[in-house]
Amino acid sequence: MGSTRLRNASVWLCGLLCLLQVVPSINADVSGCKPGFSSAEYIFSVNRRELERGRKLGKVNFSDCTTRKHGLYDVGDSRFRVLPDGTVLVKRHVKLHKDTKFTISTWDARGIKHSTNIAVASKRHRSGEEAHSRSSKLPVLTFPETHTGLKRKKRDWVIPPIKVSENERGPFPKRLVQIKSNKDRFNKVYYSITGQGADNPPQGVFRIEWETGWMLVTRPLDREEYDKYVLSSHAVSENGSPVEEPMEITINVIDQNDNRPKFTQDVFRGSVREGVQPGTQVMAVSATDEDDNIDSLNGVLSYSILKQDPEEPIPNLFTINRETGVISLIGTGLDREKFPEYTLTVQATDLEGAGLSVEGKAIIQITDANDNAPIFDPKTYTALVPENEIGFEVQRLSVTDLDMPGTPAWQAVYKIRVNEGGFFNITTDPESNQGILTTAKGLDFELRKQYVLQITVENAEPFSVPLPTSTATVTVTVEDVNEAPFFVPAVSRVDVSEDLSRGEKIISLVAQDPDKQQIQKLSYFIGNDPARWLTVNKDNGIVTGNGNLDRESEYVKNNTYTVIMLVTDDGVSVGTGTGTLILHVLDVNDNGPVPSPRVFTMCDQNPEPQVLTISDADIPPNTYPYKVSLSHGSDLTWKAELDSKGTSMLLSPTQQLKKGDYSIYVLLSDAQNNPQLTVVNATVCSCEGKAIKCQEKLVGGFDLPIILVILGSVLALLILFLLLLLFLKRKKVVKEPLLLPEDDTRDNIFYYGEEGGGEEDQDYDLSQLHRGLDSRPDIMRNDVVPTLMPAPHYRPRPSNPDEIGNFIDENLDAADNDPTAPPYDSLLVFDYEGSGSEAASLSSLNSSNSNDEHDYNYLSDWGSRFRKLADMYGGDDDEE
C-alpha cells in the first residue's frame, strides 16, 4: 500500500515538472489535431506464457500536438513499464494464466489525462510486432471468391470485426478499412454499404467512397449508445449489376473511460449490533459504471473508505472490500449509548482504483445489545392493602435502563422471589416499563397482617455480558375491613314432610363472623322463598314452616324445594352472607287417583269399552294398586273394571243405551285406601262399534238437513231482493234542464271610430240611466197573498248635467228601499247581444219565452236558498 502511494506521488510530481518545462515550447496546434493515443487499444501477442524481465512487448504512440518529445507514462499494472518513446517492457517475471489487460495513461501539455488499453495475449503464431501493425496500417477487406458450377460451396469467409475506439478525435471523416473486389481488374467496380449506421438508424455514421472502397467514419462513436455496428458491403458494375455477394462487416466500438461511476443510492443505510466481534459484516454499497468491465478495466470498480465520523473509539473501525463493496467491522468498542451512529464517506473508482471516482455516504446505526441491566429506583416500597381484595394494585415499581426504549433489551421482566401461597402477582406496563404488583388472592387480616416481598428485575432479552440483578423490597400491610358473615355449612339439607304444621321447626341455621376482634350481632333473613312456605327467626336462625308445604306444587322440583338464606352483621358497613337451604319434601297421601279422559263418546250399537287411564299425584306407596267402583246408581247401567296392569280401567254399558248424555260416578282408591270420586261424562250416539265422533245436536232440535233447507230458502230470498233493488236503481231517469235556451235575439254591438269631438269621459247618454229604472221585469206570483205597499218615488232625470250626481244617489237609495224589488235569486232576463257573445251561456236562464213543459220539482231538493224558486215553478203543478 505504501509503495503504491509513493509511486503515484512520484508520477504526479514528474508530470508537473514536465509540464512546467514544456509549456514555453508549446506551439500552435496543428489544424484539426487533438492530443491522444493513436489507438484506444493495443494488443500485444506473445509466443509463451512466461515472460522474462526486460522483454519488449510493443510500442504505444501518443501525440500531444506539440514539438516536444513525450516521455512520462503511468502503467496500471506494476509488472510492466513504458519507456519515454512508448516501448512497453516487462518489469519483472510474469506468468500468464489468461489474457492480461491493463491501462497506460499520460497527460498532454494542458494537463489532460489520456488513457489506452493494453492486452497481452499468449499466441505462438503471432508476434508483438504483428499485433502492433494493426494500429499503424489500415486493413483491406477483399470479397471472397465465388464458385460456380455444381461444386459444393465452401463455408463463407469469416471477416474479423473491425475495432474502432469511441470518442476518437479525428479529423473526420476518418478511414477505417478498404473494401476491394478482385473483379476490378477487369471492370470498373463501385462500392456501397447498407445496414446499421449507414442507411439504417443511426444513419450517416459510416459511409464508403464508391470508387475506391474506403469505408469512413464520419463522427466520434459512443460505445454506451451503440457497442457494435453490423453492415453489409456491396460491389456492383457500371450498369448496376452485382459483381460480388454482399459481405457482412462488423464494427466493434472499443470502450474508453469516459463515464464516471455512480452509486446506486444517495445514502446507504445499515446497522450493526453493539458488542459484536471484529470481522462482522455490516452492510454493502454498490455503484455502476456505464463503461466496459469485460474487455477493459474502464468499468471495473474499486471501493474505499475516505472518512469515518465520529472517529471514536478508533479512527478505522470499519473496512470495505475493494471489489464487492461489503463493509465490515475491524475494531472493537461499539457502544450505542455513546455513539449510536457512524457516517462513512465511501468512494468508488473505476480502472480498479486508478480512474474516475465518485463519493457516497453510508450511515451505520448501532443497534442496542442488552449490556445495561435495569435498576430499581427506589429499591424499597411500602403499601397498604385492604383484605379480601382480588386484583388490587398494591404498588408500581420503577426501573431505569440505559438500553434503547421499546427493545427487548429495555423491556423489564419482574419476578417475586418468595411468593408463599401465591397471594401476589406482578406484570410489566409496556408503556412505562414499570412493574405492577397486584393481589392474586384475597388477603385475610385475621390470618396475616403483613407481607415482605423480594422482587427482582431482568430484561426480556438475556444480558450480552455478565451483569448484576437489581432487587427491590416491598412491605405490604393488610388493612382490616368488615367482612361478611357466612353460614356453616354454606348449603344445608333437611327432610321435611309436606304435611308440616304451621310453626313447626325445620332447622336451626348457624352463621359465623370472620371478624373475630369485632363483636357484632348477626341477623337472619330469607332471601328467596318462591312459595312463601318458610319463616326464619331473625335472632337465632330457627326456620319454621307456614303449614302450606305441598310436594305436588310447581315450586318443588324432583321432591326438593330450594330457599336462599341471608345473614347480616351490624357493622358500619353491613356485611351480608348467603346460604342455601334445600328441603327434601316427603310425600303424604293427600291425593287420590283420578281417571282420564273425563269426557268421551260411545255408540249405542255394540259399543267398545272406553279405556280410562288412572293417575295419582302422589308417589309410591301412596299410588297403585288401585281399586275401582261405581256409585250414585251408575252401576245400574255401567260397568267398571281394571286392566291387567292395574294402571287403567275399562268402562262399558251393561245395557243398550239411548242417545244422550250420561254422568258416571267413578270411585277410585289407592293402595292406602284413599278414595277419590270423579264424575265422567259420556255421550251416546246413534252408531255402531267404536264411536269416533258423534253428530252434534242442533239448536231447536232440528236435524241438519232441515237447517240446510231453511238456510237455502233465506239465501234465495235475499238474492231476489238484491236483484229487485238493483233493477230499480238502474231505471233510467230523464232529467230536464232548468231553463231551455232561447233563440239569440240579443242586440248587436256596433263599434264607432269617431275622432275628435271632445273627451270620451264626457260623452254619455243620460237617458240610459232612466231607462234602466223603468224597464224592470214584471214578476207575478200566485203562491202567496201579495202585500200592498206604496210604490217608491224615483226622481226624474235633471236637465242640468251638474245635478246628475245627486240624481244617481237619490234613485239608488230609492231602489235599495223598494219593497217591490225582486229577491237576489229571482229569475232575470238579459238582453240579446248577438251570437258569439261571452254572455251566451246565460241564455238558458231565460225560459219566459219557452212554451215547453218542464218538471222543476227537483228544485225543492236544493235547499232553503232555492225554496222560493221551487215555489214559483212548482205552484202550477200543485194547482192542477
From Swiss-Prot:
Q: Name one GO cellular component term.
A: adherens junction
Q: Name one GO molecular function term.
A: cadherin binding
Q: Where in the cell is it found?
A: Cell membrane
**One Pfam family this sequence matches:** Cadherin
Propeptide position ranges = 29-155
**Which sequence ranges are listed under topological domain Extracellular?**
156-703
Q: Which CDD domains match?
A: Cadherin_repeat
Which ranges carry the Cadherin domain? Answer: 156-263, 264-376, 377-487, 488-593, 594-704
List S-S links within the chain. Answer: 603-687, 685-694
Keyword Metal-binding attached:
yes
Q: How does it assemble?
A: Interacts with CTNNB1.
- Record function comment: Cadherins are calcium-dependent cell adhesion proteins. They preferentially interact with themselves in a homophilic manner in connecting cells; cadherins may thus contribute to the sorting of heterogeneous cell types.
Protein name, entry field = EP-cadherin
